[in-house]
């Protein structure tokens, strides 16, 4: 049992003792309401915490569940075992319906769109009187009834709600396996890297949105059965603000964060009510202090296991590279062009990289080198031309599919989430990998000289080690083609040599390596061929010596035709 699991169990036991021994009927009512909010917050953590999207629709999903229960229960006499799953399905169905247009939006546009959806549902609830009861809502919602047992109030209802909280927590634990948490973290913190690892960010966000809606619908259904009345307030913005505040104060991640936030914010108004007209001020001050001193939630202040510190020993490349290379037929880039507005980034570029080759790409800043890497990896789509991986046309394929088919890459600036450890980062590359016989994480770490850093958070690593981690992550998926975008930038001579040894071993094992860099001293002894780009055009593609002797290359790259 982990320390946090023990804390959750202790919190549950303390709640049970409090309710049984000290709790009045009103206290039991508050604890019941807290349980409803825990479920609501657990759902909101999927989209707001793990997916990193500020959704303002969680209150709307809560309202959909509440109104569905109210209509079915009060109007048609349906019992809990019917209303509960239908409410969940309707909330999730509504989320699925709006997800396609809404999830394409980013940042504040997504927040505004979800807020608009919430307000639309509120208008429908207020004005569709024959169905929703209008401003008066729907009274007479039946209590929870299970197999002839009616749970109206008190300890039986409290116990039932918290049993459902336990079930919701179990579902969260089942959905958030370590590999999926890593995928969410990469998508949220380094969105550029996610598709390059085969992670379908759109599908992951869709899953988070649906789960948040389903939990919201479940919480709304429970609220309707325990409150016995549904009013437009259940669709009001106040529910959304309450949910958001609970999540921020308690913590965006984890069951314990949801427990802390829901329990604290449900009871705070009661604890401060003796202050009469000043209690809202006191609550506001407490929340402000919490956000300032615990920006990641109160749960982040609790002790947690610390990973081992970074070793002071210099890493050394070791091991055989054969296990990191998938059989392939090479990469062909045929006449691709790409423009951004009036800027021609690539102009009829053709390039071939065969297994066992290291093809270097040089060129001045703005020549189109990174655009070429982006077009090959699917991060951008070429306007014309053809790109083939073996016999497969990948010209317009999504980046996450291209990664799964065998093209791995690194970035000019290492794209590594600070909170994940080195081993978690490397393991994340294998979440969606389809290649058989993947190397073990330990094997990849050993080959890249990173084994001593396996438990170190990436945010604490030096720049040179971060470069190495990116390469290790790329190799863990066992690609056919490896694209390295300026891997030597900012490295010492010794670190550059180690990267070079690694590239040579990979090429000797049959990998096709595309090496983009400005450092001629690094590229010349490594590359099988060296191509030079100028203003999006390949002006030379030959052996390194012949390319560097080309007058056009000298003029474009060095600023002089003769040296």
Model-identified regions with their sequence ranges:
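Conserved ABC ATPase "signature" region
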Residues: 438-456, 501-504
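A short, surface-exposed alpha-helical micro-motif characterized by mixed small hydrophobic
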Residues: 523-525
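Helix-to-loop junction immediately C-terminal to a conserved catalytic motif
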Residues: 377
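Catalytic Walker B motif of ABC-type/P-loop ATPase nucleotide-binding domains
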Residues: 482-486
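Transmembrane alpha-helices and adjacent helix-loop boundaries
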Residues: 1-314
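The feature captures the beta-strand-to-loop junction immediately N-terminal to the Walker
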Residues: 362-364
């Amino acid at each position: 049992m982990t320390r946090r699991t023990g804390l959750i169990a202790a919190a549950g036991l303390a709640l049970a003792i409090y309710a049984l021994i000290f709790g009045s009927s009103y206290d039991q009512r508050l604890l019941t309401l807290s349980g409803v909010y825990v479920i609501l917050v657990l759902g909101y953590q999927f989209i707001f915490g793990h997916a990193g999207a500020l959704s303002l629709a969680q209150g709307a999903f809560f309202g959909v569940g509440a109104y569905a229960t109210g209509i079915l229960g009060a109007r048609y006499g349906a019992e809990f075992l019917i209303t509960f799953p239908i409410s969940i399905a309707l909330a999730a169905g509504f989320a699925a319906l709006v997800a396609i247009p809404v999830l394409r939006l980013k940042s504040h546009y997504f927040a505004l769109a979800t807020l608009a959806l919430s307000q639309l549902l509120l208008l429908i609830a207020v004005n569709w009187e024959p169905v929703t009861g209008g401003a008066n809502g729907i009274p007479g919602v039946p209590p929870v009834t299970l197999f002839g047992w009616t749970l109206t109030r008190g300890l039986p209802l409290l116990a039932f709600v918290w049993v459902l909280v336990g079930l919701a927590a179990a579902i969260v634990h089942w959905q958030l396996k370590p590999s999926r948490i890593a995928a969410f973290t990469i998508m949220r913190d380094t969105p550029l890297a996610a598709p390059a690892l085969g992670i379908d960010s759109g599908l992951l966000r869709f899953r988070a949105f649906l789960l948040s809606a389903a939990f919201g619908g479940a919480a709304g259904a429970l609220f309707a059965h325990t409150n016995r009345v549904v009013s437009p307030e259940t669709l009001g913005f106040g529910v959304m603000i309450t949910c958001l505040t609970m999540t921020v104060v308690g913590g965006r991640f984890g069951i314990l964060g949801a427990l802390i936030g829901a329990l604290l914010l449900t009871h705070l108004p009661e604890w401060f009510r003796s202050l009469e007209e000043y209690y809202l001020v006191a609550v506001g001050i407490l929340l402000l202090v919490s956000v300032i001193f615990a920006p990641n939630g109160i749960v982040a202040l609790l002790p947690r296991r610390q990973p081992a510190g970074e070793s002071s020993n210099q890493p050394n490349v070791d091991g055989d590279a054969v296990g990191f290379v998938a059989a392939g037929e090479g990469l062909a880039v045929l006449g691709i062009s790409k423009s951004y507005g009036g800027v021609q980034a690539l102009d009829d570029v053709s390039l071939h990289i065969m297994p066992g080759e290291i093809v270097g790409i040089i060129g001045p800043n703005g020549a189109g080198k990174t655009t070429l890497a982006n077009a090959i990896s699917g991060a951008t789509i070429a306007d014309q031309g053809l790109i083939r991986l073996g016999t497969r046309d990948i010209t317009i394929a999504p980046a996450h599919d291209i990664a799964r088919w065998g093209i791995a890459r690194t970035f000019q600036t290492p794209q590594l989430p600070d909170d994940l450890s080195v081993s978690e980062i490397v393991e994340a590359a294998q979440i969606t990998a389809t290649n058989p016989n993947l190397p073990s994480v330990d094997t990849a770490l050993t080959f890249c000289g990173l084994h001593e850093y396996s438990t170190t958070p990436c945010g604490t690593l030096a720049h040179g080690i971060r470069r190495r981690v990116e390469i290790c992550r790329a190799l863990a998926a066992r690609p056919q083609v490896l694209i390295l975008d300026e891997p030597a930038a900012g490295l010492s001579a010794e670190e550059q040599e180690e990267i070079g040894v690694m590239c040579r071993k990979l090429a000797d094992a049959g990998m096709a390596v595309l090496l983009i860099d400005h450092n001629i001293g690094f590229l010349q002894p490594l590359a099988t061929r060296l191509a030079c780009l100028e203003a999006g055009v390949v002006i030379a593609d030959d052996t390194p010596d012949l390319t560097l002797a080309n007058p056009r290359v000298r003029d474009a790259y060095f600023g002089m035709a003769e040296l």
